[in-house]
Amino acid sequence: MSLASFNPSRKTNKVRQHGAMEFSDPPVDLDKVRQERLVRFRKKMAEHEVAGLLLFNQINARYATDATNMQIWCSHYETRCVFVSLEGPVVLFDYADHPHLAEDLPTIDDYRVLPAFYFFSVGNRGEEFVLEFAAQISDLMNRYGGGNKRLAIDTLSHTGCDALRARGLELVEGEQITETARAIKSDDELKLMQVSMNVCQEGMRAMQEYLEPGMTENALWSKLHETNIRLGGEWI
């Protein structure tokens, strides 16, 4: 099966913020933060002696690449993932085909469309697509793993795990890598967290100003979500 593959451009005159702080000036160098996070993942990968890290948890995928695509939807289905090689490329297997969402991100070396294999997407053709998925992951492991077959995964259904094991890969618990890496915060990340807190507080102020007798709870909560989205937040 031929799948679209795209190498994002490396323009230096623009910093894609992908929703976060889209219409404001970031308080830190976002590309620096992105690179540091990827380094943390790879450091933990080396500690656990794995050649690859497969991320279906969208929080982990965002941490590794900072690329986003319908995060809530993609959190409900195995429809988008990131493969991080210890000594090779980072590959984004995206939902649908939207390479513009990965443009200019220094953390992504290869863009592909995921051959999704969950039933809602492919019905009874799941076995066909999961074999293609496993073939691509196995190829990346063989090409860049240096003979190491250990692949860490944060979360994946038995269908995907069985197909990967059939390719001779040794699957390792990935959350021990992602959680311990993400627990470390740089000074720049603390500044970004403060911005997130400021947005939340602004949303709470909007709720207080909008509150009036007789209104529904949903109407009140909508002001928090409205403020969050308007100021660059993704979801609550």
Predicted regions and their residues:
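Conserved short loop/turn motifs at secondary-structure junctions
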Residues: 150-153, 207-215
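Acidic, glycine-rich loop-and-beta core segments that form the ion-binding/anion-interacting portion
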Residues: 222-236
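Hydrophobic pocket-lining residues that define ligand/cofactor binding sites across diverse proteins
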Residues: 45, 211, 228
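A composition/biophysics-driven feature that prefers long, compositionally simple stretches
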Residues: 1-202
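Short, charged, surface-exposed loops that flank catalytic or proteolytic processing sites
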Residues: 33, 212-220
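Active-site pocket-lining segments that scaffold enzyme catalytic pockets across diverse folds
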Residues: 197-207, 217-220, 225
